[in-house]
Design a protein with these regions (language model features):
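Gly/Trp-centered helix-boundary motif
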Residues: 1-170, 174, 334, 338-348
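Alpha-helical transmembrane segments of integral membrane proteins
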Residues: 119-123, 145-348
Length: 348
């Protein structure tokens, strides 16, 4: 006998497994945050055939409090339970990571906290809020539901992952161009400097939004003309996401390249670089030993400042339908999906 197997095309990540209780069931339509009823009224027929317009109760959350029947008391108890869970987990990790410091002579249990006060306090606030939010999301729709009854909090968290993924991949694509071309232009100079300046000046003269839009539209035409090359919608979405990261990376390296060029031109004139040339050190060794370590502060600062701009660019591009695939969770797609509803139901 031959057996046939069918495989699910959607890939489940660790985040999906963790958040499974928050999104496995869908409501009918919109609902407000922490509400126990749908946002829109429906007609129901009573026992004596009398029709009445009421707000239907939510099926899965909002009416199943875990600790108390009153919502305020239940939320307060949920916060207390979250604190207890946090202190239990924190005490285990605290002792595990700082065992040697705690039990060292002349130290007490609070010594590691004094040494890492800011880090531990910041981490504690993030973890407490995460546990509290997760506990609440099992009982309520913290941010309500959308038009088809999906938990908005779940979509928002998935959208954060999409934004971070785009920012990270775009940075990985952009860094090699910016670092190497910037250093070569500034340190070597001459004809190489002229060519690199011409390249990034030309790229800067092209509006980035139009360039990205044209590239994405070309990709859409290719996918429409070759549907058999993609087994499912997730392959199409992944290709579009990857292509968007490539385009953003190829158009966002020019600013950092210009900064590194100027810094490299300054560093090549300092005494220790001139001394290295005098002792016969080749260009590659000088760049690796002296130039690159002294420009990394500019690279780190630029990456941190531009990361949020890349996430915002994804949201803007998705809003005008030239960003990630509509099936991908992102802030731009969420705003775009709710755009028509803004004129119909502004309060939503």
């Amino acid at each position: 006998q031959t057996e046939s197997f069918s495989y699910e095309s959607e890939i489940k990540s660790v985040l999906d497994i963790i958040l499974l209780p928050t999104y496995k069931n869908y409501e009918k339509s919109y609902s407000s945050p922490f509400s126990s009823n749908l946002y829109s009224k429906e007609t129901i027929i009573l026992e004596n055939n009398i029709e009445r317009r009421v707000y239907p109760k939510l099926l899965y959350k909002g009416n199943h409090n875990k600790y108390a029947s009153d919502n305020t008391a239940n939320i307060l108890l949920t916060f207390i339970i979250s604190l207890l869970k946090y202190f239990f987990v924190f005490s285990i990790f605290y002792i595990f990571f700082y065992f040697r410091i705690i039990f060292k002579s002349k130290n007490n249990i609070f010594t590691p906290f004094k040494l890492n006060k800011v880090f531990l306090m910041t981490l504690s606030i993030i973890v407490i809020l995460s546990i509290f939010l997760y506990e609440l999301s099992l009982q309520y729709y913290v941010l309500g539901t959308d038009k088809v009854g999906v938990d908005v909090l779940y979509k928002s968290i998935k959208s954060i992952r999409t934004g971070i993924l785009i920012g990270t991949l775009t940075t990985i694509v952009m860094l090699p161009f910016a670092i190497f071309l910037g250093i070569f232009a500034g340190y070597i100079g001459g004809f190489v400097d002229d060519v690199i300046q011409y390249i990034y000046t030309t790229l800067n003269s092209i509006p980035s939004v139009l360039l990205i839009a044209s590239a994405i539209l070309m990709l859409q035409v290719y996918m429409a003309n070759n549907p058999l090359n993609f087994e499912n919608i997730y392959e199409r979405a992944d290709l579009r996401l990857f292509f968007l990261c490539m385009i953003l990376g190829l158009t966002s390296w020019t600013g950092l390249c210009r900064l590194l060029r100027g810094e490299s031109m300054k560093l090549r004139e300092v005494e220790y670089v001139q001394a290295s040339k005098t002792f016969g050190l080749n260009r590659f060794s000088i760049i690796v030993r002296h130039i690159m370590p002294n420009i990394m502060h500019i690279v780190i600062i630029t990456i941190v400042l531009d990361f949020s701009a890349l996430v915002l660019a994804e949201a803007v591009l998705s809003y005008v339908n030239i960003g990630v695939d509509p099936t991908t969770y992102s802030w731009g797609n969420m705003i775009n999906a709710a755009r028509l509803e803004m004129s119909k139901e502004p309060i939503v």
